[in-house]
Amino acid sequence: MANIKAKKYYSYAKINLFLHILNKRPDGYHNLQTWFTFLDLKDQLTFSFNNSREINISSNISIAAKQDNLVYKAIKKFQQSYRVQDIGVDIEIKKNIPMGAGLGGGSSNAATTLIALRDYYLPQLSNEEMIPLAAKLGADVPIFVYGKSAWAEGIGEILYHKDFSPQYALLIKPDIHISTKEFFTSEDLIKSSVLISKDLGFDKSIMHNDFENVFYAKYPEFSQYLKELDSDFRMTGTGSCFYLLSADKNKLEQLARKINKPLDKWLVKTLNYVY
């Protein structure tokens, strides 16, 4: 197969507008309900396919070794599932989405890799047809393959297109590393089998992130600071990034200027579509 010109793809961040944990499944995953929307915060992945039969991944930051890297795992799953052999590709990842933030950066990169492989090897394959494969890579990967704001159930692979009214989002991230496994097993995580109707609009009174209680119990000082800034800050995923939504960009800019702690922060917009 001949070399082709390098092709660039954007790999977007997501937030969970709410996250409701239902129960643990026999396979170790948890059933959940959530509403995903995207942000215009994005990584850039450049794919250069070639005849080398080698997979090379580089980045502007330190990344996991091949066998632990979701991009590499996505390539191997694609090969196994669609019987595509002898893949040769150089992938350059320019990271802008912070890692370990609950913004889905690694999952987004894996999904973008599946789409790039599809475009090159199996262009007749639809995004929706790749969702079962995406789910094998992780609970957040399917939404990035789907590419539209969506209500999600199951482990995140059962998706219903559901737009969210576009807003600005102020993101803040403390220098805190979250153990997803620890949060899922925490006594402070309250699981409920009561389902929320996907037909509801965005209702802050019932739509919250079940992991916030775990975070608040573990980091009470930061949690108090957050509430003093604005009580409507919400956590995405298992954190450690929090966001505040508003249609008023100036309000968020003013609030960002008030932050007097060494926190990473971004002012971004929500997106309903990324493809």
Curated annotation (Swiss-Prot):
- This protein's gene is called ispE
A single BP term in Gene Ontology: terpenoid biosynthetic process
Please state the pathway this protein functions in, per its UniProt record.
Isoprenoid biosynthesis; isopentenyl diphosphate biosynthesis via DXP pathway; isopentenyl diphosphate from 1-deoxy-D-xylulose 5-phosphate: step 3/6
Q: GO molecular-function annotation terms?
A: 4-(cytidine 5'-diphospho)-2-C-methyl-D-erythritol kinase activity; ATP binding
- Which domain of life does the protein's organism represent? Bacteria
Its biological purpose is as follows: Catalyzes the phosphorylation of the position 2 hydroxy group of 4-diphosphocytidyl-2C-methyl-D-erythritol.
Question: Transmembrane ranges?
Answer: none
- Family per record: Belongs to the GHMP kinase family. IspE subfamily.
- Name of the featured protein: 4-diphosphocytidyl-2-C-methyl-D-erythritol kinase
Query: So what EC number does this one have?
Result: 2.7.1.148
Query: Which keywords does this chain's UniProt record carry?
Result: ATP-binding, Isoprene biosynthesis, Kinase, Nucleotide-binding, Transferase
What is the reaction catalyzed? 4-CDP-2-C-methyl-D-erythritol + ATP = 4-CDP-2-C-methyl-D-erythritol 2-phosphate + ADP + H(+)
Q: Which InterPro entries match?
A: GHMP_kinase_C_dom, GHMP_kinase_C_sf, GHMP_kinase_N_dom, IspE, Ribosomal_Su5_D2-typ_SF, Ribsml_uS5_D2-typ_fold_subgr
Q: What does the record give as the active site?
A: K14, D140
Q: Where does ATP bind?
A: P98, M99, G100, A101, G102, L103, G104, G105, G106, S107, S108
